[in-house]
């Protein structure tokens, strides 16, 4: 059913779903895409890793940057936290730290290479484009759900940030009312993504949808219907 839906849509689509109770996986058209703001979920994980290592203090400033980056998708908060991943507070050093973390944890399709805009600070990059995939996003969310991303207490903090998400018009809007969901969106004029942990009536699951359609807004109702289809299939 999902394959048929994706085939009928314009552009490139990836969908990754994992039932967190029985381990069943649906992984359709996995490919690297420009992640837009979904990269922020990985910046969050690396930041907590730096806190756990004692390289960064979990203070009010850092907490506020994490909250802004995740719950309202603030670009400047993300750019700052990338700097905070380095002792020198250099953006490119911070990005290198994040990429070392990603490769150590097996996020092979994800890389952080430049700042996000619009933002107060000016553009910084190492010449490559940011990349990720629906599958890498799904693996990250599963680890957060299981309490194995950085540590159980930091996984809980990450889950709480995602649960406070304000950008709810993609995966969450396809779900029955009252269903708890922790998500992070990403969008530009050409890509539309959402990554979510859904706490369903019968089972909890991860769902990540990446789309590159080239036309702004085209994907939103389609992500919503993918979300509803998956929910009904796993929770009927």
Sequence positions of predicted segments:
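Short, conserved catalytic-motif segment at the N-terminal edge
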Residues: 10-33, 52
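Structured C-terminal helix/loop/strand segments within mature extracytoplasmic catalytic/sensor domains
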Residues: 1-3, 7-9, 25, 139-169, ...
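Soluble periplasmic/extracytoplasmic beta-strand elements of cell-envelope proteins
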Residues: 14-19, 42, 80, 206-208
């Amino acid at each position: 059913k999902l394959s048929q839906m994706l085939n009928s849509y314009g552009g490139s689509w990836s969908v990754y779903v994992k039932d967190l109770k029985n381990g069943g996986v649906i992984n359709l058209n996995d490919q690297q895409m420009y992640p837009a703001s979904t990269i922020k979920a990985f910046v969050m994980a690396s930041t907590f890793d730096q806190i756990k290592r004692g390289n960064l203090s979990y203070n009010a400033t850092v907490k506020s940057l994490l909250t802004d980056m995740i719950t309202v998708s603030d670009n400047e908060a993300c750019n700052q936290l990338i700097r905070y991943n380095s002792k020198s507070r250099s953006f490119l050093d911070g990005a290198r730290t994040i990429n070392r973390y990603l490769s150590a944890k097996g996020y092979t399709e994800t890389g952080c290479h430049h700042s996000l805009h619009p933002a107060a600070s000016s553009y910084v990059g190492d010449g490559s484009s940011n990349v990720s995939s629906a599958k890498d996003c799904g693996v990250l969310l599963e680890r957060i759900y299981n309490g194995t991303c950085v540590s159980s207490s930091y996984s809980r903090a990450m889950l709480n940030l995602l649960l406070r998400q304000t950008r709810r018009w993609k995966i969450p809007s396809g779900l029955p009312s009252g269903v708890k969901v922790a998500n992070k969106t990403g969008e530009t004029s050409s890509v539309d993504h959402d990554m979510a942990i859904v706490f369903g009536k019968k089972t909890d699951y991860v769902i990540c949808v990446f789309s590159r359609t080239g036309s702004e807004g085209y994907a939103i109702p389609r992500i919503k219907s993918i979300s509803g289809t998956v929910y009904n299939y796993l929770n009927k």
